[in-house]
From Swiss-Prot:
Major location category of this protein: mitochondrion
Keywords from the named record: Membrane, Mitochondrion, Mitochondrion inner membrane, Transit peptide, Transmembrane, Transmembrane helix
Membrane topology, from the record: Single-pass membrane protein
InterPro entries: Cyt_c_Oxase_assmbl_COX16
Range of the transit peptide: 1-23
Localization (cell): Mitochondrion inner membrane
Similarity-based family: Belongs to the COX16 family.
One record GO biological process: mitochondrial cytochrome c oxidase assembly
Highest rank taxon of the organism: Eukaryota
Gene name tied to this protein: cox16
Protein name: Cytochrome c oxidase assembly protein cox16, mitochondrial
Pfam families: COX16 (PF14138)
GO annotations of cellular component type: mitochondrial inner membrane
Transmembrane segments: 35-55
Protein species of origin: Aspergillus clavatus (strain ATCC 1007 / CBS 513.65 / DSM 816 / NCTC 3887 / NRRL 1 / QM 1276 / 107)
Taxonomy of the source species: Eukaryota, Fungi, Dikarya, Ascomycota, Pezizomycotina
């Protein structure tokens, strides 16, 4: 039986192997020896660089929002009907709009309702929809 060599086979770095293959082989060979230097450090650098790139984008987003929502002057508020000439009291409000008072007032208003006398009513179902009756 023939005897095989103990050395592992390594491809010769000839002109036929591309630069990318040679760099990849060197990277894979060095990765077990220096994992933080070849994997951890580039990862951390990408995260930090991404943070610096995204900071102006976030600032632009909030500046755009601030341009939309700005504080109105007294004259602009009067033009929009948000304030009357004598302040908040001169505003005509929708009478159907319910403005809640304090919690105590709301509590007593709810307690005054008669919650014991009620009747369950069935909701009308669509055609073909099961109504839950057996």
């Amino acid at each position: 039986m023939p005897v095989f060599q103990a050395k592992t086979f390594r491809r010769a770095t000839t002109a036929s192997s591309s630069l990318g293959e040679r760099i990849g082989a060197a990277y894979r060979g060095g990765l077990p020896k220096h994992p933080f230097l070849l994997f951890g450090l580039p990862f951390i650098m990408v995260i930090v660089a991404g943070s610096f790139v995204l900071t102006p984008a976030a600032a632009l987003r909030y500046e755009r929002y601030d341009r939309k929502v700005k504080q109105l002057s007294q004259e602009e508020a009067m033009e929009l009907g948000l304030k009357g000439p004598d302040g908040e009291e001169g505003i005509r409000r929708n009478p159907r709009r319910r403005i809640l008072g304090d919690e105590r007032e709301e509590y007593y208003r709810l307690m005054a309702k008669d919650l014991d006398n009620w009747e369950q009513k069935r909701v009308q179902r669509f055609k073909g929809e099961p109504d839950g009756k057996l």
